[in-house]
Structure formats: structure tokens, C-alpha cells
């Protein structure tokens, strides 16, 4: 049986915040992604105040083979709670294959989310009108300047 995976590429703290509260103290949330090295260290450190406030333990595991590993995990049904994909196209594929949990299935105010973020960022985590996640970072790989 497939375990649905929640993708989150800025929504992570919003979603975890919605899960906050004493009733979840001691619970662990697992996250995997492609952040490694100092990026991984910084990402882990960013959740320390959240853990102190809520008691929810956030466990992040980064890998330079994330894309291959997450495919194997999805196919086996042994997925983390959250995944940070570096490519939006991979999110589309995972959603189309039924591996992702729509944010509407969680206690997330999607109207507020869409008001708070640009339509472009919302679109990165949307597949066929269903929102599965959102961008926590963007990289500019190239740019073309034109001045007439």
C-alpha cells in the first residue's frame, strides 16, 4: 500500500504550525530532500525553535541522491512525511502517480495561502488545480537581458 507523501518545497512551517500544540509533543516529523552540508545544517537549525515551542521533533535527512532515493521510497510505500524536491517537474510526476497528499486534505487555509504567496510560487506546487506544496527557495539559473 502506498503511503501518501506530503510535498513541501515555505509551506513546511505553515503546515507544521497547523500541527502544533501540546497534543503532538514528542511526535516526530520526517523530512528528506537534496539539501546537504551547510545547507542541511542550516535547515535543521531552523526547526530548533519550532521543536522547543511545540515539542514536535523535526528530523531532516539530506542526500545527494535524493531524486533516486525518493522514487524508491515512493514505490515501496516507505516515505518520509515531507519531501523537498529541487525540481518542480518531479512534483508533477509524483502527484500524477498518486504519491502526494493534497494540502486541502490538511487543516490549511488555502485561500490565505494563495493570498500570501504569488501565483507563480503557488503554481510550482499545483498539479491539475490541486495544491500539493509550495516553494521554499528559487534559484536563478540564467537570465537574458534585452535593452532596445
Question: Each predicted region: which residue ranges?
Answer:
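Short helix-initiation/N-cap motifs at beta->coil->alpha
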Residues: 62-69, 88
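Short, well-ordered beta-strand elements
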Residues: 26-37, 56-61, 81-82, 132
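Short, low-complexity disordered leader/linker segments with a strong preference
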Residues: 1-30, 52
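A residue-level structural signature of the nucleotidyltransferase/glycosyltransferase Rossmann-like core
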Residues: 82-83, 143
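Short helices/loops that flank or line small-molecule/ion binding pockets
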Residues: 68-79, 97
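N-terminal capping loop/helix in small sensory signaling domains highlighted by a polar->aromatic N-x2-3-F motif
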Residues: 147-148
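Hinge/lid segment of periplasmic solute-binding proteins
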Residues: 88-144
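Short, polar/charged alpha-helical segment
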Residues: 37-57
Amino acid at each position: 500500500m502506498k503511503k501518501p507523501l506530503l510535498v513541501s518545497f515555505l509551506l513546511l512551517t505553515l503546515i507544521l504550525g497547523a500541527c502544533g500544540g501540546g497534543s503532538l509533543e514528542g511526535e516526530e516529523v520526517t523530512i528528506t530532500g537534496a539539501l546537504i552540508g551547510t545547507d542541511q545544517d542550516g535547515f535543521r537549525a531552523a526547526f530548533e525553535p519550532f521543536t522547543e515551542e511545540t515539542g514536535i521533533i523535526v528530523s531532516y535527512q539530506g542526500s545527494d541522491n535524493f531524486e533516486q532515493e525518493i522514487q524508491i521510497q515512493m514505490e515501496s510505500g516507505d516515505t518520509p512525511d515531507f519531501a523537498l524536491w529541487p525540481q518542480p517537474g518531479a512534483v508533477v510526476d509524483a502527484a500524477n502517480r498518486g504519491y502526494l497528499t493534497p494540502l486541502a486534505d490538511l487543516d490549511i487555509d488555502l485561500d490565505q495561502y494563495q493570498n500570501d504567496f504569488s501565483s507563480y510560487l503557488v503554481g510550482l506546487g499545483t498539479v491539475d488545480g490541486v495544491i500539493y506544496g509550495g516553494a521554499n527557495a528559487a534559484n536563478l539559473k540564467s537570465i537574458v537581458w534585452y535593452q532596445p
